[in-house]
Amino acid sequence: MTARKSMAWLLLLILPAGFAGVWRLQRKVNVERDAMYQEQDEVLVRSPKLMKLLTLEYATLAADIYWTRAVQYYGNKHLGEETNLESLWPLLDVATTLDPNLLPAYRFGATFLSQPEPRGAGRPDLAVQLLERGLNANPTYWRLNQDLGNVYYLELKDYAKAGQTYLEGSKKPGAAPWMKVMAARFLEKGDSRETATILWSELLDSSTDEAIKETARINLELLRTDEDVDQINALAQRFVAKTGRPPTSIGEMAQAGLIGGEPVDPTGHPYVIGLDGKARVSSKSPLFKEKSVYRRPL
């Protein structure tokens, strides 16, 4: 019994010390493991020029290695739910410098860079830089215009640049017909009505696709209503200045000598004045429904 008590007391003294030792060992292992992962982020040469000199005729192979490393890096960070993607750009920079024709690196790399954290690096500026480099090296590849236009539209909210980028891509060999359609829509959203009108007119005259021709026709009619409504609203402001209140109808504006006749939309339906005193397409006009379809958010 005495021997058992002695053994129990001995275990009580030894076990805490043993657990403490195991804890310290595990902590050291964790620290070294984290340091190893951190080292993996930094292990490859970051200088594109230096890598170009080192690899010589093996540059294309080295580019594939760097691109593969970029994909693995992005995937591992997501699996570990980490948001620090600071090594992503250097990897893509080296890969596309070593092989300027590595198209997947431009396309998917731009997606990795442009998406907001935690899905991506939150660096649309670097995505633009990467895609512009790709376009310089691959000037006839219209898909890069599509990708660049998407970055301008989705991440930077620059609709005019998105439209111009899509328009440039639409002129390249093999470009999909919808590139010009999207260019026109982006330019409309960016208030570039004149350019959008030219594009829709070209599509109406040149396209052999009846669906595209119908889309072009309706959008041209909607653009005309935009111009008409703006002009009527400008006259409505003069009515307010003259009477101290907004107009309630087009007829009231005509009685005030501000407008002659009854302006109608391209389908022949008169415009109306809403409760807010502003002009709009009549709910009786076919364009009222078309506007809700063709002017939905992109």
Regions picked out by a protein language model, each given a short descriptive name:
Residues 94-95, 133-134, 166-169, 202-206:
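Canonical positions in the second alpha-helix
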